[in-house]
């Protein structure tokens, strides 16, 4: 019975982890989030490095283009990608490509903004110094630049995962009919779903909250240890 407190029970958690429909939805959502985060972080990092080492006008142009998806409402972005991919390019909506592209367009600018400050904090002479010490361009990039900005890359990846999990509007416009993420499933489940499914989703919310708290605590502890060193 919803709304009546009758003591502590793990019944809803059992329902959550034993219902195949919910497990399939959660697994698909996590796989999508990790894939989108990887692509977004890769594109955001490449864009940030290119913007940092490009000329002033080129850097300003990249920064301006990066602001467009952020300033746009998600509904506009989702509908635009739906029209672009499906109507103009003829991509089948039953594939995952429109969804993958849509969420990457949403997340990549935030990954870019996470990496760029780390580049600005870095000594601008490190790259040239690495070249002078015998590194080629690829070695200087991977062994010096990427290591220096790794905290920003990690932050961009985690932020992209969060944005992908949270997104509803872009997912609604671009997802295949047979696929649901946590956000779209929860919205649909509030419209006449069985009581046990609704309560299992409450349990899922508690699990997500606990995982986020543990991740934040772990990252803060790791950062504190680095500062002590």
Residue ranges and their predicted role:
Residues 34-66, 79, 83-87, 141, ...:
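Transmembrane-helix boundary motif in ABC transporter permease subunits
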Residues 23, 27, 31-43, 47, ...:
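Hydrophobic alpha-helical transmembrane segments of multipass integral membrane proteins
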Residues 1-37, 191-196:
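Periplasmic/extracellular loop-to-transmembrane helix junction in inner-membrane transport proteins
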Residues 55-58, 116-127, 131, 137-144, ...:
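C-terminal transmembrane helix and the adjacent membrane-cytosol boundary/short C-terminal tail
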Residues 2-3, 10, 75-107, 138, ...:
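Membrane-interfacial helix termini and adjacent extracytoplasmic/periplasmic loops
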Residues 53-62, 91-96, 137, 151-152, ...:
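Membrane-helix interface segments
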Residues 13-21, 165-227:
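Interhelical loop and adjacent transmembrane-helix boundary motif
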Residues 112-115, 122-124, 137-166:
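Transmembrane alpha-helices
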């Amino acid at each position: 019975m919803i709304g009546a407190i009758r003591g502590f029970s793990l019944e809803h958690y059992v329902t959550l982890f034993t219902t195949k429909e919910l497990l399939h939805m959660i697994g698909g959502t996590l796989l999508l989030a990790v894939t989108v985060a990887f692509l977004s972080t890769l594109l955001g990092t490449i864009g940030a490095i290119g913007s940092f080492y490009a000329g002033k006008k080129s850097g300003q142009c990249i920064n301006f283009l990066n602001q467009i998806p952020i300033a746009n409402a998600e509904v506009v972005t989702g509908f635009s990608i739906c029209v672009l991919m499906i109507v103009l390019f003829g991509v089948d909506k039953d594939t995952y490509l429109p969804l993958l592209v849509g969420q990457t367009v949403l997340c990549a600018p935030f990954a870019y903004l996470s990496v760029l400050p780390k580049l600005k904090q870095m000594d601008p002479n490190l790259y040239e110094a690495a070249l002078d010490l015998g590194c080629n361009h690829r070695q200087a990039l991977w062994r010096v630049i990427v290591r220096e900005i790794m905290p920003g890359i990690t932050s961009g990846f985690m932020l992209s995962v969060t944005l992908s999990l949270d997104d509803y509007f872009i997912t609604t416009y671009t997802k295949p009919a047979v696929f649901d993420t946590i956000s779209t499933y929860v919205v649909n489940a509030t419209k006449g779903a069985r009581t046990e499914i609704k309560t299992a989703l409450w349990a899922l919310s508690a699990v997500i909250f606990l995982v986020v708290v543990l991740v934040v605590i772990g990252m803060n502890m790791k950062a504190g240890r680095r500062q002590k060193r």
